[in-house]
Amino acid sequence: MDPISSQIQECTSKELIEMESEFAAHTYHPIPVVFKKASGVHVWDVEEKQYFDFLSAYSAVNQGHSHPKIVSALITQAQKCALSSRAFYNEVFPQYAKYITEYFGYEMVLPMNTGAEAVETSIKLARRWGYVKKGIAEDQAIVISCKGCFHGRTIGVISMSDDPSSYNKYGPLMNGIIKIDYNSTQQLEEVLSQHADRVCGFIVEPIQGEAGVVVPDEGYLKKCYELCKKYNVLLVADEIQTGLCRTGRMLCSDWDGIKPDLVLLGKAISGGLLPISAVLGGKDVMLTIKPGEHGSTYGGSPLASAVAMAALDVLRDENLAENAQKLGEHFRAQISNINHPAIQLVRGKGLLNAIVIDPNFTVSAWDICIKFAENGLLAKPTHDNIIRLAPPLTITLEQIDQCVSIIKKVFDSFKN
């Protein structure tokens, strides 16, 4: 018997949920659906019920679940050489480094594993650049972040958050952070002008995902870029959720026609098969960190490198940015046509969208998502009254229309 499968017994959803509650730390509040298998835009629970996936593991499976090309790359490389650590060179990483930098038009990549690691790495890079290149006085560097941001769960990252549920009773937090309103270039310039000699970086999500798919004013990111150039500050674009075709462009910052100083990638860079992340930037910034001063055992592994190249191939070869743009416009138009008192607003870009539920409506976003699941569609609330809707980018027009019908049916069931 396969030693792995011998440890995985046939259990009901109820049994598995209870088992997890007993033996795993309570860090999430999941919709009570237990995945057993997944393919493309669909997942199946342990009772074999099929669902449309409209969360995509927070946009980690843009290429669809278990894309055969990415799975094949993983299996082939895993059977050959999965891990070398960066103590030695390996055959695949140098080729991946060349591939991804040329793919996005940057000079260098720093490979990590999780999105939060990429964010932490960018903070270290920005600070180091500030001290070495800009001449900021030692231990005086400032990073600007936005209220409503979500960049991860590590101590450094939650220090940039203004959400008490992220940082409460985890202090002391990291110093050297100034938080400004998202979508306010006026506040950005005020802080930059007041602390011009101390600010090393401004980290921003092109669209705030966890905040509820908050789309800034047109041209916001371009103005931020111009201000950062004016005050000699690094613009760091967290594209971990918004990048890789999700919003209808390869990077969401492409909508503004800019090239951030640092770009952070994660999630869909592996097609959902492995934790892989990357920081892209110019040599002027990247080479401020010397050998032995930063790293990761698994970052840049042969396995991660092969998987990431396959995942990026799929995004481009299957024109997933174009599909996201076209179907996103169609989806928002269809959802906006649903006349229901609970729907306060529909917003988004590409296939990163959200329905804002009127907080005074008698049914919560959670209740609506539970009803979605009962009808074969999986989505998750964020910030109590917002439902994020982000299917794999491989979804078809016919499937989008099927899902719109499910969404309409669920809202209609709450009319009375």
Swiss-Prot record:
Belongs to the class-III pyridoxal-phosphate-dependent aminotransferase family. CDD domains: OAT_like. GO terms for biological process: arginine catabolic process to glutamate; arginine catabolic process to proline via ornithine; L-proline biosynthetic process; ornithine metabolic process. Keywords: Aminotransferase, Cytoplasm, Pyridoxal phosphate, Transferase. It comes from the Eukaryota. Its EC number is 2.6.1.13. The gene is oatA. InterPro entries: Aminotrans_3 (IPR005814), Aminotrans_3_PPA_site (IPR049704), Class-III_PLP-dep_AT (IPR050103), Orn_aminotrans (IPR010164), PyrdxlP-dep_Trfase (IPR015424), PyrdxlP-dep_Trfase_major (IPR015421), PyrdxlP-dep_Trfase_small (IPR015422). GO terms for molecular function: identical protein binding; ornithine aminotransferase activity; pyridoxal phosphate binding. GO terms for cellular component: cytoplasm. Its cofactor is pyridoxal 5'-phosphate. It is found in: Cytoplasm. Coiled coil: none annotated. The modification N6-(pyridoxal phosphate)lysine is found at K267. It comes from Dictyostelium discoideum. NCBIfam families: Orn_aminotrans. This is Probable ornithine aminotransferase.
